[in-house]
Amino acid sequence: MVQQNADRLARIAEEILDIARVKHQISHANSSTIALDGTVAQVWHDWRDQDPARRRGQLHLGAQDIHVEFDPEHLRRVLFNLLDNALRYMGPEEDSLQLSTRVTASGRASVQVWSDGAPLDQSIERHLFEPFFSSESRSSGLGLYICRELCERHGATIDYQRTGRTTQRGDMQGNAFTVSFRKTGRLKEPASLFDTVVV
């Protein structure tokens, strides 16, 4: 018990320092104009390559030639966090996790991480993006808070909703986290999926 408490305090201390580092990065970072589909595709492949046996899912790109204002490293961090969270609760099927981009009729672009996990309790949903809130004792509850801070820095929004997706098993309900970007424009020339490389 003593060791568990000590480990938990150590994690909290490290994560408080992480918040300070992120806030420093946010205050000194400038938004870049990035090709959305290219950046998302690169992040997806980087994430999967870390553990190909476990990190499975589907990528759907629907924002061809669209660029948005966002720091590529910040978007990478947001997506890694959302994908890691989805991986914990998704089912065993190949399409249990889906990463997608789209552009609305009004021209606003977004990227969404969807998984077929169980619905969130309303008491959890209300506090999702608050610092240090978590439904698990081993989690600090800082991941989604940091995602929100990074999105707000670049004029984007992040939200959660329970929504359906078409899968090989039919229409399924799942948990979706969506980042909607502030500014959207079309590239002058069609962008390759790997025009933007995030390292």
Regions found by a protein language model. Give the residues of each.
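Conserved micro-motifs of the catalytic ATP-binding
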Residues: 24-29, 67-70, 135
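Short alpha-helical segment of the dimerization/phosphotransfer core of two-component systems
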Residues: 4-9
